[in-house]
Amino acid sequence: MAAMSEDSCVNFKEMMFIDNTLYFIPEENGDLESDNFGRLHCTTAVIRNINDQVLFVDKRQPVFEDMTDIDQSASEPQTRLIIYMYKDSEVRGLAVTLSVKDSKMSTLSCKNKIISFEEMDPPENIDDIQSDLIFFQKRVPGHNKMEFESSLYEGHFLACQKEDDAFKLILKKKDENGDKSVMFTLTNLHQS
C-alpha cells in the first residue's frame, strides 16, 4: 500500500470538547475546504421530459410543450438553458444551477418547494451546503436520462406534472418505484 503524501494531511495543534463533540484545531486552515458551492463553468442545453416535450420558460414559469426544431429555434431564449456547474465540497452529484437569458438572466429556484425562475444571475459562490438554486444533476441508472435533486430539500426532484391542460415543472418527493416524471433528456447546444 502506498504511503499518503504529506501534502494531503492536516496537522492539528489542539483538540477540544464542546458540548460532547470533539473538535480538532488545525495548525493552518488555509488549505481546508469550506462547505460551499463555487461556480466553475457553464454549458447550454435543451431539456426534454419523458414525452419529448421541451422545457419552455414562459413569463418565468417553466412548462413543457410539444415543439418542432423550428419552433424551438424561434423560442431559443426561452428554451436554451444555461447550466452552471459548481464545485461542491461534498460528493452528491454534479451541483448545477439552471438559468435562461432573454433580455435579463433568470435562475431556477425551489424556495418553499415552489418552482419558478427568479430574475438574477447565478451566484459566484454560495456559502452553504444547501441552496434553493442548486440541484444535483445525476444520471438515471439503466437509462440515458438525467434527474435533478434539490440540494435544499433532500429526496425532492424536479419533475414534470400535468396540471389542467399544461405540463409544468414542479418539485416533488421521488417515488422509488421507477418514477419517470423525474427523468429528463439533456441535449447539449453549441456555445454562441
From Swiss-Prot:
Q: Which GO terms describe its cellular component?
A: cytoplasm; extracellular space
Q: Where in the cell is it found?
A: Cytoplasm; Secreted
Q: Which family does it belong to?
A: Belongs to the IL-1 family.
Record-linked Pfam families:
IL1
Propiece span(s): 1-35
Q: Sorted alphabetically, which SUPFAM superfamilies does this protein's record hold? A: Cytokine
- Enumerate the UniProt keywords alphabetically: Cytokine, Cytoplasm, Inflammatory response, Secreted
What biological process terms from GO does the record include? angiogenesis; cell population proliferation; cholesterol homeostasis; defense response to Gram-positive bacterium; establishment of skin barrier; extrinsic apoptotic signaling pathway via death domain receptors; immune response; inflammatory response
Question: Which residues make up the annotated site Cleavage?
Answer: 35-36, 69-70
GO MF terms here are: cytokine activity; interleukin-18 receptor binding; receptor ligand activity
What is the recorded function of this protein according to its Swiss-Prot or TrEMBL entry?
A: Pro-inflammatory cytokine primarily involved in epithelial barrier repair, polarized T-helper 1 (Th1) cell and natural killer (NK) cell immune responses. Upon binding to IL18R1 and IL18RAP, forms a signaling ternary complex which activates NF-kappa-B, triggering synthesis of inflammatory mediators. Synergizes with IL12/interleukin-12 to induce IFNG synthesis from T-helper 1 (Th1) cells and natural killer (NK) cells.
* Domain of life where this protein originates: Eukaryota
Query: What name does UniProt use for this protein?
Result: Interleukin-18
The subunit field of the Swiss-Prot or TrEMBL record says: Forms a ternary complex with ligand-binding receptor subunit IL18R1 and signaling receptor subunit IL18RAP at the plasma membrane. Mature IL18 first binds to IL18R1 forming a low affinity binary complex, which then interacts with IL18RAP to form a high affinity ternary complex that signals inside the cell. Interacts with cargo receptor TMED10; the interaction mediates the translocation from the cytoplasm into the ERGIC (endoplasmic reticulum-Golgi intermediate compartment) and thereby secretion.
Q: Which InterPro entries match?
A: IL-18, IL-1_fam, IL1/FGF
Instruction: Describe the processing and modification events after translation.
Output: The pro-IL-18 precursor is processed by CASP1 to yield its mature, active form. The pro-IL-18 precursor is however not processed by Casp4/Casp11 in rodents. The pro-IL-18 precursor features autoinhibitory interactions between the propeptide and the post-cleavage-site region, preventing recognition by the IL18R1 receptor. Processing by CASP1 induces conformational changes to generate critical receptor-binding sites. The mature form is then secreted and released in the extracellular milieu by passing through the gasdermin-D (GSDMD) pore. In contrast, cleavage by CASP3 inactivates IL18.
